Regions:
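Structured beta-strand-rich core segments of catalytic domains in phosphoester-bond hydrolases
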Residues: 38, 46-120
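Short amphipathic alpha-helices and their capping/turn segments at secondary-structure boundaries
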Residues: 21-25, 98-108, 137-149
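Soluble or luminal CAZymes and related metallo-dependent hydrolases
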Residues: 12-16, 94, 130-137
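Surface-exposed cleft-lining segments at the edges of enzyme active sites
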Residues: 84-90, 118-135, 168-170
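Active-site-proximal beta-strand elements of phosphoester/diester hydrolases
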Residues: 2-10, 110-120, 154
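N-terminal, active-site-proximal structural segment of metallo-dependent hydrolase catalytic domains
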Residues: 1-51, 56, 61-67
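Short catalytic/ligand-binding loop motif for oxyanion handling, primarily in non-cytosolic enzymes
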Residues: 13, 41-43, 65-66, 121-124, ...
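Metal-dependent phosphoesterases centered on the DNase I-like endonuclease/exonuclease/phosphatase
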Residues: 31, 52-55, 134-170
């Protein structure tokens, strides 16, 4: 069995102070996706760069204390893709640290695991428009990916389609 976990950390250092490291050790996951790192590369100590024996790969936001995603894996990926690159032709979202993909390709099987943090859109009309632009980029990107490989998308997609999916429905 392959154990896959996804966590919105709301800050990796804060999560570590609240018990992330022993929790991850006890969980024995094969792969762990994280969102909202809120840390730069220089902020990641060795204990945060590798968790529970799983080395991590990260897409940090340029803005300090903002966004960022990562993937930790017990298994060596055949490739790692940081950011959307050419799939984000305007370059709007890569500076926000929203996408990291690990590829685990073997003869006869292509598999990707993606950790992604979709924009929320709840803070302003401008951010809602940014969220729509992000969705307009992601939909064709995932369709192209699906045509060439299997993938698992994990993360914080910031989409709730029913009132029951929201803690404080307004």
């Amino acid at each position: 069995m392959f154990r896959l976990v996804s966590l919105n950390l709301n800050g990796i250092r804060s999560a570590a102070n609240k018990g992330l490291l022993p929790w991850a050790e006890a969980l024995s996951a094969d792969c762990m996706g994280v969102q909202e790192l809120k840390a730069q590369s220089a902020d990641l100590t060795p204990a945060l760069s590798t968790i529970a024996g799983m080395p991590g790969q990260f897409h940090h936001a340029e803005k300090k204390g903002y966004s960022g995603v990562g993937l930790y894996s017990r298994h060596e990926p055949s490739d790692v893709i940081i950011g959307l690159g050419a799939n984000d032709p305007s370059g709007e979202f890569d500076p926000e640290g929203r996408y990291v993909e690990m590829r685990f390709d073997k003869p006869g099987r292509k598999l990707s695991i993606i950790s992604c943090y979709f924009p929320s859109g709840s803070s302003s009309e401008e951010r809602q428009e940014a969220k729509f632009r992000f969705l307009d980029i992601m939909a064709p990107h995932l369709a192209r990916l699906k045509a060439e490989r299997e993938f698992i998308l994990i993360g914080d997609v910031n989409i709730a389609h029913k009132e029951a999916d929201l803690k404080n429905w307004k």
